[in-house]
């Protein structure tokens, strides 16, 4: 996979990595596109991004494995996202980092294929996970449907299969992986006018950008509308319900912020590739290309920071990890297993309205916080689950 040949055809690189007639990556190595100082700075930036990405995402995985209270279906999606970001930090920038140290691409065609495949696969996993997470928020907040681990694991399996299909297509002949414009990594052939290659680029934009972004916007738009409507319902104005509504809003904000930050980091890369596809590749210089690449890879650093600062359970778990004995004495009941805490359902609000309106009992699950209002206080929760919609009205879900 390693090639020590540093001599090359400068004209090939001036036309761009995706120019027609370009030789496969590794058969011809380019002359340096940047100065030695620039390569050193790029290596330093990539090394810092990789270290921060590995450290932050490993911390998320450690917290999830150590603290049972974090083991919920929603957190499982966050862990899958962190796993994808961790793999990007470990494998997605390795060849580019080594090439920066050698002042240019030094790998053969197999190395180029692996670099393009790994970067594409883990990037697709991230955007698809954020899309599924938005849908999960949507069905739980808007439709008050509770998902379980079985649903979450199936969704994660489909996420990886879907991403693997898109990343593996160029290896099977639908488009190909070639050296990028900056000459330090590989990507799909954006410039090719061949019908086979251009059709892949078109469907890739639709399947991995337009559709996911559309689903994310639709889901969070409905979540925002539903939360505002629920806050206007007079019967829900109890202290506990108001707290839950605020909690739902915070969770939705956190998930939306993750999607927004991810798309913001990838937007320069998407714009530059869109210019190349539409015949404006001369505007995308190697410097512009590598800067957009660095912005895209920086997305792996931000998600762990968002978890810690916006998710109270992750924040408390981190503090408990750092000061275990002190917090264990202060909060002995906080580290109960998730399965144990979900077994008991208890009433939290009893409200009596004036007139002939029956007494209403609001119950909830102490882990997933499912509010159930029944018109008959003698009706048990088990009976409520089997009763018709006229007797039971599920009005809110707290998922984490």
UniProtKB/Swiss-Prot annotation:
Q: When the coding gene is removed by deletion, what phenotypic consequences does the entry describe?
A: No visible phenotype. Increased weight gain on a high fat diet, as a result of increased fat mass and increased insulin resistance. Increased basal glucose uptake in brown adipocytes, potentially as a result of decreased GLUT1 expression. Significantly reduced lipocytic rate, mitochondrial DNA expression and cytochrome C oxidase activity in brown adipocyte tissues. Loss of light-mediated increase in glucose uptake, mitochondrial respiration, thermogenic capacity and lipid metabolism-related gene expression in brown adipocyte tissues.
From the Swiss-Prot or TrEMBL record, give the protein name.
Opsin-3
Residues where lipid is bound covalently (S-palmitoyl cysteine): 323
Organismal lineage: Eukaryota, Metazoa, Chordata, Craniata, Vertebrata
Q: Does the keyword Cytoplasm apply?
A: yes
The chain's disulfide connectivity reads: 112-186
**Do the record's keywords include Isomerase?**
no
User: What biological process terms from GO does the record include?
Assistant: cellular response to UV-A; keratinocyte differentiation; negative regulation of apoptotic process; negative regulation of melanin biosynthetic process; phototransduction; positive regulation of cellular respiration; positive regulation of D-glucose import; positive regulation of melanin biosynthetic process
Q: What do the Gene Ontology cellular component annotations say?
A: cytoplasm; plasma membrane
Membrane topology per the entry is: Multi-pass membrane protein
What's in the keyword line of the UniProt record?
Cell membrane, Chromophore, Cytoplasm, Disulfide bond, G-protein coupled receptor, Glycoprotein, Lipoprotein, Membrane, Palmitate, Photoreceptor protein, Receptor, Retinal protein, Sensory transduction, Transducer, Transmembrane, Transmembrane helix
Where does the source fall among the domains of life?
Eukaryota
Which organism encodes this protein?
Mus musculus
The record places the following residue ranges in the Cytoplasmic compartment, namely 64-75, 136-151, 228-253, 311-400
Instruction: Name the protein family.
Output: Belongs to the G-protein coupled receptor 1 family. Opsin subfamily.
- Which proteins does it associate with, and in what oligomeric form? Interacts with MC1R; the interaction results in a decrease in MC1R-mediated cAMP signaling and ultimately a decrease in melanin production in melanocytes.
In this record, what's one Pfam family? 7tm_1
Tissue expression, per UniProt?
Expressed in the eye (at protein level). Expressed in tracheal airway smooth muscle. Expressed in brown adipocyte tissue; expression becomes more abundant during differentiation. Strongly expressed in brain. Highly expressed in the preoptic area and paraventricular nucleus of the hypothalamus. Shows highly patterned expression in other regions of the brain, being enriched in selected regions of the cerebral cortex, cerebellar Purkinje cells, a subset of striatal neurons, selected thalamic nuclei, and a subset of interneurons in the ventral horn of the spinal cord.
Q: What is its main location?
A: membrane
What is the recorded function of this protein according to its Swiss-Prot or TrEMBL entry? G-protein coupled receptor which selectively activates G proteins via ultraviolet A (UVA) light-mediated activation in the skin. Binds both 11-cis retinal and all-trans retinal. Regulates melanogenesis in melanocytes via inhibition of alpha-MSH-induced MC1R-mediated cAMP signaling, modulation of calcium flux, regulation of CAMK2 phosphorylation, and subsequently phosphorylation of CREB, p38, ERK and MITF in response to blue light. Plays a role in melanocyte survival through regulation of intracellular calcium levels and subsequent BCL2/RAF1 signaling.
**Which residues carry a glycan?**
5, 196
């Amino acid at each position: 996979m390693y090639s020590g040949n540093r001599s090359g055809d400068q004209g090939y690189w001036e036309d761009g990595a995706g120019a027609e007639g370009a030789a496969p990556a590794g058969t011809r190595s380019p002359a340096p596109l940047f100065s030695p100082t620039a390569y050193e700075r790029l290596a330093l930036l990539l090394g810092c991004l990789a270290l921060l990405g590995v450290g932050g995402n490993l911390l998320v995985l450690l917290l999830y494995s150590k603290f049972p209270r974090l083991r919920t279906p929603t957190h499982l999606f966050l862990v899958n996202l962190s796993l994808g970001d961790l793999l990007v930090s470990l494998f997605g920038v390795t060849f580019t980092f080594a090439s920066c140290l050698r002042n240019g691409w030094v790998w053969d065609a197999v190395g180029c294929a692996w670099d393009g495949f790994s970067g594409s696969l883990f990037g697709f996993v991230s955007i698809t996970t954020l899309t599924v997470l938005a849908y999960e928020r949507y069905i739980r907040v808007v439709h008050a449907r509770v998902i379980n681990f079985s649903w979450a694991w199936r969704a994660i399996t489909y996420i990886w299969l879907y991403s693997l299909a898109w990343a593996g297509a160029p290896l099977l002949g639908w488009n190909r992986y070639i050296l990028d414009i900056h000459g330090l990594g590989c990507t799909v052939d954006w410039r090719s006018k061949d019908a086979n290659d251009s059709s892949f680029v078109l469907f890739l934009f639709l399947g991995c950008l337009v559709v996911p972004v559309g689903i994310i916007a639709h889901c969070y738009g409905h979540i925002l509308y539903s939360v505002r409507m629920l806050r206007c319902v007079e019967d829900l104005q109890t202290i506990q319900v108001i707290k839950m509504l605020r909690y739902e809003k915070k969770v939705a904000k956190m998930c939306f912020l993750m999607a927004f930050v991810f798309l913001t980091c990838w937007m320069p890369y998407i714009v530059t590739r869109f210019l190349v596809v539409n015949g404006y590749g001369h505007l995308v210089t190697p410097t512009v290309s590598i800067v957009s690449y660095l912005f895209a890879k920086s997305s792996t650093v931000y998600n762990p920071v968002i978890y810690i600062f916006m998710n109270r359970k992750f924040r408390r778990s981190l503090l408990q990890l750092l000061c275990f004995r002190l917090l264990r004495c202060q909060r002995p009941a906080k580290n109960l297993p998730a399965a144990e805490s979900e077994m008991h359902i208890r009433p939290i609000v009893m409200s009596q309205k004036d007139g002939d309106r029956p007494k209403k009992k609001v119950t909830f699950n102490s882990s997933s916080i499912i509010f159930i209002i029944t018109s008959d206080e003698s009706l048990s929760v088990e009976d409520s689950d089997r009763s018709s919609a006229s007797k039971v009205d599920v009005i809110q879900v707290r998922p984490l």
